[in-house]
Amino acid sequence: TQENGISVLLIKRKIEPFINEWALPGGFVLNDETLEEAVERELKEEAGVSINYLEQLFTFGKPSRDPRTRVISVSYFGMVKSSDYSLLASTDAAAAEWFNIYELPSLAFDHKEIVEKAIARLRAKIVYEPIGFELLDRKFLFSDLEQLYMKLLGREIDRRNFKRKIMSLGLIIELEEKAPVLTAGRPGKLYSFDSEKYKQLKVNGFDLNKLL
């Protein structure tokens, strides 16, 4: 993510097909590595990025999706704080940049379809599973959590009901420490995550559908 919302990491291809066009990072799996290891390697090689959260998304296999030959792609999506990384393009990537999901350039292959499916999956999951929390600082304001959900959902939420539900889950802990006051007003309350409750909810899930 970035400050202004969800962004997608893209690389500019420096080989055919689709030379000089933007695409998702990716490549072929080596004989001695798992699919997840291939994802991690390609991200490191093409953009200098390591991943916090990795999930298999979908398998794309239309016969005409790659002009070279029949290629079946197993796609993954992950979440990182873009501010934590200085992108470094290498191997077959001429450049690597973050693009807001509402301002995407034309994409090579069927990568626009892959991005759309990833966004839809993410927005469906966050109402029943605590994903994305690793994008916040270790200590955070509740408004930071609200902003995270609104960025991921792409819309406003019912803040009062959202806070009541989140607090009832026991997922976050109110700290004695207060946030520094940057403007006139009272210092904001700081929170942290209950790591054990977080692990439990990752397994059992919850339902925020009616509150968002």
Each language-model region and where it sits:
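Long, charge-rich, low-complexity alpha-helical segments
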Residues: 156, 164-175, 187-196
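Short helix-coil junctions and helix-kink-helix linkers
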Residues: 147-156
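Active-site segment of metal-dependent pyrophosphate-handling enzymes
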Residues: 36-40, 44-90, 102-103, 123-132, ...
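Short, well-ordered beta-strand micro-motif
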Residues: 10-12, 77-79, 192
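Long, intrinsically disordered, low-complexity Ser/Thr/Pro-rich regulatory/activation regions
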Residues: 178-212
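N-terminal strand-loop-strand
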Residues: 1-23
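Short histidine-centered catalytic/ligand-binding loop motif
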Residues: 24-32, 134-135
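NUDIX/MutT-family hydrolases
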Residues: 77, 87-121, 135-143, 161-174, ...
